């Protein structure tokens, strides 16, 4: 063989290859309608369809939605929103891949044991069946039919979509998304997973969508997402700095307990029971030298500076010249053993504080954290989360109806009522899929947010530091005060003795109030006005001071005051889905022997 030449490999063969599966696809028109009623603010699942690998879906929708008859033609915007997601089955069930493939272990060749087989997680309808207007109803499951089985994956998908796209992680706990072979039972009170005898099946619920973000709803519950960052002062080998008290109060027999601002030992006119550094001496009788802690005087325990509880061994005696004098308690810190903060420690503290502040503002979901800290968008597929496909937005048009028939005291001529509807046609998405899963469509209706009970921040500028200064523009978050959303008398105090008006409701970026202007509601449009006309609008009206929590962040439009019949569903809708599906299957399934 010539130098440098190589012999061909004898292992060149086709045994490491398999033929490519070439599956012909066919197009199907799967257009259909969906008629329903629903209430504002809820996330209603109005579309669900299973997906096969190799599918391509193209979806458009046309709708006619009517709002229940209005008392007056309201002066507010109502927005109808549809949003569609793809949720792979592997995110909803841990054993999906083993189920659909039969398993990737050698036992799959020989096992005939049914225990090794998987079945799709399923639940059974309860006694009395599912109620109308429940999440089960909107998914299309039969209502008022008891004890029939159905799979649970689309319901798990709803909870997962809510957690990933709608939940405010600063204020709301995540919904349970079980991925095992069955949904566990839960405690009927707490909703937590439980193995107790009184545990009940988990009931999936229709969730409210959250309010759109504004000055109040985007407020943060704290200055940063994490512990406050301190600048430490170190001291001595012990890591402690000594604090010395210069005086303590006395206790005389029959003296009132309110003389004490902190506890000491009981006092005898002839003995001193404290050393110079504040520790007990042997004057306590049965109490050893150096004992520290609390002990009762007249059955009242007064805390000491140093630790555990000691027993009382005597009774206080009267004395006109007590060895300890009542008065203030000046103390000082001995900094001789301390060391200063280094510049590097200061840098670390400032940078960590900025990291906590950025995490609070951008969010803590992985995709949000990567986007906020690195400026990189992490695709839904790579983040192992539901994939947003597309959606639509349309406004509800309000049309006045003028009374032009006979006049009476209830409805004179020229009286205005109204009807409202939304009609639109939108292309939603075209998407090809490579794995099994579900397409879930969610429908919701929300109104613009306005407030009418707060004091705009500009009216509370009393100090020059309350005004904008460029020097302070990049300081940390600033408080949004309770009075800005719900103003009360300054005499209303909280348990700590602070005026409730001046207690923080939440926190916003520095000088956020200069960057937006709140809408106003005045005159008889105010809900607290005598003879109010608030049925003309949908501004928020709080019965009590709201708190920045899960209840506040959920959308709760006061639509009932504007409706002629508030106990009926807010909307009645008719949807038509123009739905084209290209699927890896023949146009017709013709029985025969052509494949054998």
From Swiss-Prot:
**What residue ranges are annotated as transmembrane?**
none
Task: Keyword check for NAD, yes or no.
Answer: no
Mainly localized where? virion
Q: Name one GO molecular function term.
A: structural molecule activity
Q: Which UniProt keywords apply?
A: Capsid protein, Host cytoplasm, T=1 icosahedral capsid protein, Virion
Q: Which InterPro entries does this one have?
A: Capsid/spike_ssDNA_virus, Microviridae_protein_F, Microviridae_protein_F_sf
Mind telling me which GO cellular component terms the entry cites? Answer: host cell cytoplasm; T=1 icosahedral viral capsid
User: What does the UniProt entry say about where the protein is found?
Assistant: Virion; Host cytoplasm
- UniProt record similarity statement: Belongs to the microviridae F protein family.
Q: What does this protein do?
A: Assembles to form an icosahedral capsid with a T=1 symmetry.
Which named protein is this?
A: Capsid protein VP1
